[in-house]
């Protein structure tokens, strides 16, 4: 029983950064912007969060720094793609490469240094309930943030007028502009929110998941978050389910290696990425699934005077 509970705990921990980053990207894509820089923003959030936490001794300051760094990196993306109308795909890829390189340079002095960790929110009495106690009432703070964030985004997109406006921009920015909606303003806010979420996800990696700095510690999670949005057909609750499925795959390969299963470790390590590719291939083969809820203006630049 203890082994099962521990496995479920590690799955929740592995799923949390995927969920936070994917929910942020979902809001960005609902506005019609395709941000392929999630991986770069996540790794910059990781190094920023670890650095601030290490220098101040406070994981909470580290967490705030991770959010700010991710938001600033996304602001750069927004200026380039929204104000300067650069290609969103090329810009996102460039920022990912920049983030990976810059984080490696900044993090050189942090390699091998002891980190600070966000404490778990152990609720006295409740966390001693068999099985569910540790799973529900003994998690790290960002576990609860990720669940609350999913519920909040779901409510915002489908229960508020502002959310409806954001979705209308993603479906047809020209029509929204004709109605007097400030398309660029909405997209700026959506992109910054997505970047802040990516930074927060990176902060989880360096302050909770592995409280130390390791170069390229995001390990492709930003790309998996992007795939999760497509897998979920741009629906928040499906992102939640998908994050835990991919989290289980991620943890499954680690436990398989620990238990000495006679399969090459390189193959086991590639399982999360293979699962991502398989899911995207299956979805792309089904035209109905591909078009379901896809924002019609996704990836298209908007320049009012054209």
Regions inferred by a protein language model and the residue ranges of each:
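Membrane-interfacial amphipathic/re-entrant helices at transmembrane-helix boundaries
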Residues: 1-21, 34, 48, 55-64
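Inter-helical junctions in multi-pass inner-membrane proteins, predominant
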Residues: 3-8, 157, 194-227, 262-263
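Hydrophobic alpha-helical segments embedded in the membrane of multi-pass proteins
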Residues: 15-23, 40-47, 71-76, 170, ...
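Short, non-helical or kinked segments that cap or interrupt transmembrane helices
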Residues: 27-45, 82-95, 165, 189, ...
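Alpha-helical transmembrane segments within multi-pass membrane transporters and channels
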Residues: 57-102, 245, 250
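Transmembrane helix-bundle core of multi-pass membrane transporters
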Residues: 100-159, 259-268, 292-306
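Helix-loop-helix "hairpin" substructures at the membrane interface of multi-pass membrane proteins
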Residues: 135-213, 236-241
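Cytosolic-side transmembrane-helix boundaries in multi-pass membrane proteins
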Residues: 153, 171-178, 182-185, 256-306
